[in-house]
Amino acid sequence: LAKLDIVKYVVSEEGVKSYIVNKLLELLNSKLLHYLKRLDSNSICIFNEYFEEEILNEKNKVCSYFNFSGAERKSIDLACLFTFSDIRRLQGGVQYNIAIYDELFDSSFDEKGIELITRILQDRVEELDECSIVISHRKESIKAVTGDVIYLEKENGITRRLDYKEI
């Protein structure tokens, strides 16, 4: 009977599952805090054991996601994106080194925000050997991106690649 009780405890909500979830939450929340700080955010996002988020403003008061400005919400979104990407890298046997960001710079961010995001992307390229593809409709945001730039133009429903001389 004692062995059965041990097995029941191990597979129960308080056993191994709880231990693993708590370790994952510790990593998840520390990564989120790391990226929010790098994005110069005044908010803190914390996930609980049910993976429900709680967002604290600069006064450490719980706030709705929708009470934040567009740039602040985008910072929270990107912190979550980078965090889950990092955690995914640690899981499983399949490794990948490509990330595609569609319209990453196209809304809400000022020059400083674009610079902070660019630094994160550059660090991911250097530290994780990640190939980052950024799709943008804003020509001014291309200045922030390093590496090769491919210009596309859509005219009459047809998209074509532009030669650098055509720009």
Please place each PLM-identified region on the residue numbering.
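Terminal ABC-like ATPase head and other globular end-domains that cap long coiled-coil arms
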Residues: 2-167
